[in-house]
Amino acid sequence: MEAIDGSLFTAKHAGGYAWWDFIKNLRQIRDDGSSLAIPSDSPGHWTAALSAGSRLRLAYDVDLSFAEKLRNGDLRGGLLLGDSLYLVNRALFVMTNASGPKNIEFDLPPSFMIATPWTEIAERHFRAGDNRELTENWTIFGRFPVVGFNQRNLQVTFAFPGVSDYEESLLKPLFEPVLHEYLRIFPQTPATHLFFAFFHGAEDNGEGFLNSTTLTTSDPISPKNRILWTNLLAHEIFHHWNGGLLVPAEDEKTSWFSEGVTEYMANRTISRTGLISTELFLRKLEAHVAMYDYWMWAPPFQKTTLEGAGGDKDFNRPAVYSGGVVAAFCLDTKIQTQTGGSRTLEDLLQLMMQRYGLTGKQWGSDNLVRDASEVTGVDLSDFFRRYIRNREVLPVKTCLGDAGFDAALSDYAGEPFITLQEHPSLTARSIRARLRGRNAR
């Protein structure tokens, strides 16, 4: 490897892992083939003896026993999954201060596959742009299912280490309709290649890396819990656009939008594409309305607004996610009623993509108010002032009624019941039809 000095180091402590603990027997290989042990001079750091500008040849072992046991947070480190091994690359590499690309070559059994976001430059030979791209991603080795998607400028690779053949058969039909729908919503999507790993872990969780994303579920993948895993995958994929390309300048103030709009669009998408029934979509919407209503009513949350909830996303999860869904639904419905159905929340997202996603600019709360008002054709600052920046309860019944649904709500008990209106207005019928999609069942 290239070296500008004798400094050697691993990635910094992250995800509950001290990566240097896994590096064993680090040694420098001399020109004559002999080796010289390099002792650690501090956690995660060694110093090799060499002249400036020299190339350095190292050998070391990596103790992967940490990946043998299921544990919370294993998606941030590694996990052995039957015939495959998922590893966050921080566990593998000792680095130098030399800048520039890093070439990686693997010597593996011929039957083994490799999935990684690094650029493949030859068979089993890859290139990472720098130390960060080298380590802040994952690699999967072994035998595992892979699903690919390639349309227009978007290429996506989904890897499923440890997933059974039956589970694979359930997962595969999800990706194409979801991604087609997202590309329809964002036709301006710039060229990119996304990498997702999805497997059974100790918890239901997700972790984003530099060029890759990992999702884990603690439950089996089955038709009975389809709403859970379809929602999880559709939600995290949508974050490529909302949160990945549309980057907020004030994350704490806009978490309700980043998470709530993402959750709303994910649920709407799996309903519109026929992956779940309208009944399941309504049950999911009921759950979000229930959590939002309870959050608005319960004493521990009385001093928090939707805008302020992002300051403690875990504690205020009912606001950030469920409240965000209700706000997104009401905003979508308001845009459609004000424009006679000619504009929707999609138009707002497309405008934001044009102004921020494609320019690299971040957006703030004031930008959102301005953009939403522009799309709707009326000033929506009062909507954001009352329901987002202050604690006035969103008009859930009105929003649902405008979309062709009846609702019975009991705020203090968190018990909403949503049903289809028997005789909706023409406007409500069209809003409901757009929500349910062609493939609604």
Name each region found by the language model.
Residues 1, 357-441:
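Beta/coil-rich, acidic/histidine-enriched accessory regions frequently appended to metallopeptidases
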Residues 3-15:
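Ligand-binding face of N-terminal immunoglobulin V-set domains in extracellular IgSF glycoproteins
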Residues 14, 59-141:
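Extended, low-hydrophobicity, Ser/Thr/Pro/Gly-biased non-transmembrane segments
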Residues 17-76:
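A surface-exposed beta-strand-loop module
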Residues 19-29, 63, 90-91, 99-116, ...:
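Zn2+-dependent metallopeptidase catalytic core
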Residues 145-254:
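Juxtacatalytic substrate-recognition/specificity segment
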Residues 250-325, 338, 354-359:
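Acidic/His/Gly-enriched intrinsically disordered linker/tail segments
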Residues 298-370, 378-381, 387-394:
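Pan-zinc metallopeptidase signature
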